[in-house]
């Protein structure tokens, strides 16, 4: 993983190009991320930044974390995340510095990770896209039942990982190779092409893309 930012998903809109084409974008607000710790090869075996995002009352921070924030001379945050760094990335930055949206540029491709919307307990039709059974012709009880979930005496059990009913959503999801359409430094906004995981107001983590798009190869 390379350097990234923690932001808040605001919602979706669209923008128009000079030729009149409509591009759907997700608006992400990135409050400046405060560096709380710089990890180095000499002390930790790898290079990384630990950053804090948002604000939290000092009364709601436990003593170990309060000491950690105090050592870096930064305000306590809602979230604390770590980003691995390459050998040449941000070599001059130090604890207490702020990372803003200007570390990204328009046209850059990024990966975005967020917590998907929780949809509660769902059956196999909604959860795993199973087909329904017959609506008529003698079927009166099992229209949306999954059917057989195992075999006979051999192996005599249900395989681990079998697709069944259960919790849907509320898991972390990463979308890759999303293009940054616009960087608004004044308002701390990123406009990223397409949809991003999570509900409006949810936390998202934006990092440089780990893959190259076909047109970039």
UniProtKB/Swiss-Prot annotation:
Keywords: Methylation, Ribonucleoprotein, Ribosomal protein, RNA-binding, rRNA-binding. The modification N5-methylglutamine is found at residue 153. One of its GO terms (cellular component) is cytosolic large ribosomal subunit. Gene3D superfamilies: 3.30.160.810, Translation factors. InterPro entries: Ribosomal_uL3, Ribosomal_uL3_bac/org-type, Transl_B-barrel_sf. The keyword Membrane does not apply. One of its GO terms (biological process) is translation. Methylated by PrmB. Residues 134-154 are annotated as: Disordered. Transmembrane segments: none annotated. One of its GO terms (molecular function) is rRNA binding. Belongs to the universal ribosomal protein uL3 family. PANTHER family: 50S RIBOSOMAL PROTEIN L3, LARGE RIBOSOMAL SUBUNIT PROTEIN UL3C. Part of the 50S ribosomal subunit. Forms a cluster with proteins L14 and L19. HAMAP family: Ribosomal_uL3_B. One of the primary rRNA binding proteins, it binds directly near the 3'-end of the 23S rRNA, where it nucleates assembly of the 50S subunit. This is Large ribosomal subunit protein uL3. The gene is rplC.
């Amino acid at each position: 993983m390379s350097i990234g930012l923690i932001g808040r998903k605001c919602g979706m809109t669209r923008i128009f190009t000079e030729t009149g084409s409509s591009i759907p974008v997700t608006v992400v607000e990135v409050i400046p991320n405060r560096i709380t710790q710089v990890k180095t090869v000499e002390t930790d075996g790898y290079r990384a930044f630990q950053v804090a995002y948002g604000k939290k009352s000092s009364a709601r921070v436990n003593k170990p974390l309060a000491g950690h924030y105090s050592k870096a001379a930064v305000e306590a945050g809602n979230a604390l995340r770590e980003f691995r760094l390459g050998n040449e990335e941000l070599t001059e930055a130090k604890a207490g510095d702020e990372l803003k949206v200007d570390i990204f540029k328009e046209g850059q491709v990024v990966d975005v990770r967020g917590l998907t919307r929780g949809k509660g307990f769902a059956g196999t039709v909604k959860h795993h896209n199973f087909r329904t059974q017959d609506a008529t012709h003698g079927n009166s009880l099992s229209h949306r039942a999954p059917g057989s979930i195992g075999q006979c005496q051999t192996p005599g059990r249900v395989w681990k990982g079998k697709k069944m009913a259960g919790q849907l959503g509320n898991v972390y999801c990463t979308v890759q190779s999303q293009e940054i359409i616009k960087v608004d430094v004044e308002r701390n906004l990123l406009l990223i092409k397409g949809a991003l995981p999570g509900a409006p107001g949810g936390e998202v983590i934006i990092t440089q893309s780990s893959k190259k798009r076909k047109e970039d190869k």
